[in-house]
Structure formats: structure tokens, C-alpha cells
Design a protein with these regions (language model features):
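Aromatic/hydrophobic pocket-lining residues that form the small-molecule binding cavity
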Residues: 18, 113, 117, 192
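C-terminal regulatory/interaction regions
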Residues: 159-210
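Active-site HxH/HxHxD metal-binding segment of metal-dependent hydrolases
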Residues: 1-65
Length: 210
């Protein structure tokens, strides 16, 4: 027998994350905490937080402080949570162990994702607890590698566009993600689109036609 569950925290509202929140809250009387979805694409539209947390909001108990860090990128309403006493980041889908995160526009935003990674570098992290995969050490090195990986992929996009500026998405993904198994190219194409949207916003690429 332990303490009563007081909060049920959702990092974001993708369908593999938040749908279980409501029945847990109903069974325990806990307060639902998280950001509501900003759109309906792949989102749990039934999610209704009692506390719509914002960046830097803190859950305070006698035993811990859990700080919300708004980390848009994977999806616009994504939050990471820092267990301050332990230096453990509950990373949701912002960081995965053994895989990079798929960025799905329009709610997924590559520029915001990279900036969110850089923001996390400013926090005193000791461990990263991803929603998918095991606990991760060396958080600063992990964050820096992820930023460098995305920027290296972006550089590859730019290089391929310099050779053929009118290439379509289906062809470009085979060139930019030639190190990734073909079976994953449908997912890679989504992140590639996110890279291209970022480059277009920065006036370094231009969409022509469909």
C-alpha cells in the first residue's frame, strides 16, 4: 500500500501515449497534467487535462519537484519533465534510445525540434528516461549528438538539392537516407519533409508543384 496517485502526466497526445490517462485518472482520482493537442492529426482528441501545463510550470510535492519543459518538435504540444532532485529527464518521444525520432509535419517541426534539443542542454541533467528504450546516461553528449546528426542530415539534403534542385520527395529520400533500410523510408520521408520545410522557411529551398 503506497500513497494515493495525485497526478497522471502526459508528455504529449499521440495515440500511443495519452489514451490511458483518462481511465487511470478515473480509477485513482488523480489530476491529469499535460498540454492539450493543438491539432487533430494522429492526436488523442479525448485528452482533457485538469492542468494545462506551460513551460517552467512545476509539480511540487513533499518528495519531489517535477518541472515541465516545453519541447516542441516531435509534436507541438510535447513536454519533457525534469525530476529536479534526481536530475532525470522524462523525455517522452523527444529522445529515444536506439532510434531517432520521426518528425511529422505540420505539427512536427524540425527547426523547433533542434532548438528544443539545444534548450535541454542548458538543464542539469544526469539521466534521460525515454518513453521508448532504456534509461540513458551521458545526457549532454546524447543531446549534442542528436543536434549534430540532424544538422548533418540537413547538410546532405542541401548537397543533393545542389545537384538536382527539382528532385521529388520519393527520389530525394533514397539519396539522403541511403544509409537507412528501405523498409523505413516511408518514415524517413516524413522527417525529410520536415527538413525541407525548415529550409524553405530559412529561404534555402523552395517547393515547386506538388
Amino acid at each position: 500500500v503506497g500513497d494515493r496517485i495525485k497526478w497522471v502526466v502526459a508528455t504529449h497526445t499521440h495515440l500511443d501515449h495519452s489514451p490511458a490517462v483518462a481511465p487511470i485518472a478515473k480509477a485513482t482520482g488523480a489530476q491529469v497534467v499535460g498540454m492539450p493537442p493543438a491539432d487533430k492529426l494522429f492526436q488523442d482528441t479525448t485528452f482533457q487535462p485538469n492542468w494545462a501545463m506551460q513551460h517552467d510550470d512545476v509539480i511540487v510535492s513533499d518528495d519531489f519537484h517535477l518541472r515541465a519543459i516545453h519541447t516542441p518538435g516531435h509534436v507541438s504540444n510535447h513536454l519533457c519533465f525534469l525530476l529536479e532532485e534526481e536530475g532525470v529527464l522524462l523525455a517522452g518521444d523527444h529522445i529515444m534510445n536506439g532510434s531517432t525520432v520521426v518528425i511529422v509535419p505540420p505539427s512536427g517541426d524540425m527547426k523547433a525540434y533542434i532548438e528544443s534539443l539545444q534548450l535541454l542542454e542548458t538543464y542539469p541533467l544526469l539521466k534521460i528516461a525515454p518513453a521508448h528504450g532504456e534509461l540513458m546516461g551521458q545526457p549532454l553528449e546524447t543531446l549534442r549528438w542528436l543536434v549534430e546528426h540532424r544538422l548533418a542530415r540537413e547538410a546532405k539534403v542541401i548537397d543533393k538539392l545542389a545537384v538536382n534542385s527539382s528532385v521529388n520527395l520519393a527520389t530525394l529520400v533514397t539519396q539522403v537516407y541511403d544509409d537507412v533500410d528501405v523498409s523505413l523510408h516511408d518514415y524517413a520521408q516524413l522527417s525529410l519533409l520536415a527538413h525541407l520545410i525548415k529550409l524553405e522557411k530559412e529561404l534555402r529551398a523552395k517547393s515547386v508543384g506538388e
